[in-house]
Amino acid sequence: MRLNTLSPADGSKHAPKRLGRGIGSGLGKTGGRGHKGQNSRSGGGVRRGFEGGQMPLYRRLPKFGFTSRKAMVTAEVRLSDLAKVEGGIVDLNTLKAANIIGIQMEFAKVILSGEVSAPVTIRGLRVTKGARAAIEAAGGKIEE
């Protein structure tokens, strides 16, 4: 088997419909669009969310809440990810260097998910109560 001999399995690919190629094809003349009307026209059809003049769902439902801009630049870090950081000192820059959080992140919070194996020092990150207990139980410490 070679890359140039690969082909799709029999029956897995269907030929596209050839529209407007005579009445014998079953899709001649109007090409499956019917006669007249908005959808028969070139570029015809209604916009997304349009319900035929009925008040659309996105306008029937109330507005609520907002998107926090701080949440966009805040990352959650699992306890199990802390082992991927070299040196035992974990701060925002070492997390970025280890590709655990994105470069655009400005804040990080360590959460209790997984286990911490080696003692680590956390600097300048927020830590949940459960994660704090697990880090201190493993011999690590948290510096604000």
Swiss-Prot record:
PROSITE patterns, A to Z: RIBOSOMAL_L15 (PS00475)
Compositionally skewed regions (Gly residues) per UniProt: 21-31
Region (Disordered) location: 1-53
Keywords: Ribonucleoprotein, Ribosomal protein, RNA-binding, rRNA-binding
One Pfam family per UniProt: Ribosomal_L27A
GO molecular function, one term: structural constituent of ribosome
Gene Ontology BP annotations: translation
Gene Ontology CC annotations of this record: cytosolic large ribosomal subunit
Protein function: Binds to the 23S rRNA.
Family: Belongs to the universal ribosomal protein uL15 family.
Assembly mode: Part of the 50S ribosomal subunit.
Protein name, per record: Large ribosomal subunit protein uL15
Organism: Erwinia tasmaniensis (strain DSM 17950 / CFBP 7177 / CIP 109463 / NCPPB 4357 / Et1/99)
Species lineage: Bacteria, Pseudomonadati, Pseudomonadota, Gammaproteobacteria, Enterobacterales
Gene: rplO
